[in-house]
Each structure stands twice: as C-alpha cells, then as structure tokens.
Amino acid sequence: MIVGIGVDVVDIERFGRQLERTPGLRDRLFVPAERELNTRSLAARFAAKEAVAKVLGAPAGMNWQDCWIGLDHNGPTVQVKGTVLAVAEAKGVKRWHLSISHDGGIATATVLAEG
C-alpha cells in the first residue's frame, strides 16, 4: 500500500549560494557523511529530504539530520531515525523508494513511501 508520494526540485546554483551565505546550514541539514559532497549532490539530497518531509506531512520539529540519503548497489536510499522515524512509523511506512537526478541546473527527487 502506498502511504505517500513526495516530489521536490532545487535550483543547484541558488542552493550553493545559500550554503555559502549561511555558514551553519550545511551542518544543520546534512549528516557528516553527506557534508563533503559537491553542491550538485547536496542539492539532490536536500530535494530528497524535502520530498520525504512532504510524504510525512512536513512534521513540526523534524530534525533534518534524522533523514539522510545513502547509497547501495541499487542506487540512493532513504535512511531515517529519531523524529523522522517516529512519524514514519506512526504513518505505517515500512519501505522507502527514491529517485534523484540533477540536470540543467536543477536537482529533483521523488520519494514513495510504502506501508
């Protein structure tokens, strides 16, 4: 059963400027393993996190570091803990599906939550 679908797009150049202007933003939005990635990859991961938030109804108090984007042999994966895991479990999410892409200066992500 599909619990929800979320989609988000991020302008890569604009996102890069935001990271430069706001020194703590990278640390607030990303786990240590993500922080060293290039701006294009960070924008795609942020789009994925936003898509996860949309699936969950953009819960108040969501900690951005409680959701991170990993990689396995099949591609990108959604990983959750803490605040995000609690809301996902309450909504019955058992499995995440994620597609991310970046082209033409835009990063996009689509997340499907399955229960």
From Swiss-Prot:
Protein name: Holo-[acyl-carrier-protein] synthase
Pfam families associated with the record: ACPS (PF01648)
EC code(s) of this entry: 2.7.8.7
Location(s) in or outside the cell: Cytoplasm
Family the entry assigns: Belongs to the P-Pant transferase superfamily. AcpS family.
GO cellular component, one term: cytoplasm
Provenance organism: Pseudarthrobacter chlorophenolicus (strain ATCC 700700 / DSM 12829 / CIP 107037 / JCM 12360 / KCTC 9906 / NCIMB 13794 / A6) (Arthrobacter chlorophenolicus)
A biological process from GO: fatty acid biosynthetic process
UniProt keyword list: Cytoplasm, Fatty acid biosynthesis, Fatty acid metabolism, Lipid biosynthesis, Lipid metabolism, Magnesium, Metal-binding, Transferase
InterPro entries in the record: 4-PPantetheinyl_Trfase_dom (IPR008278), 4-PPantetheinyl_Trfase_dom_sf (IPR037143), ACPS (IPR002582), Ppantetheine-prot_Trfase_dom (IPR004568)
Residues reported to bind Mg(2+): 8, 50
Cofactor requirements of the protein: Mg(2+)
Role according to the record: Transfers the 4'-phosphopantetheine moiety from coenzyme A to a Ser of acyl-carrier-protein.
GO terms assigned for molecular function: holo-[acyl-carrier-protein] synthase activity; magnesium ion binding
Lineage: Bacteria, Bacillati, Actinomycetota, Actinomycetes, Micrococcales
Main location: cytoplasm
Reaction catalyzed: apo-[ACP] + CoA = holo-[ACP] + adenosine 3',5'-bisphosphate + H(+)
Top EC class for this record: transferase
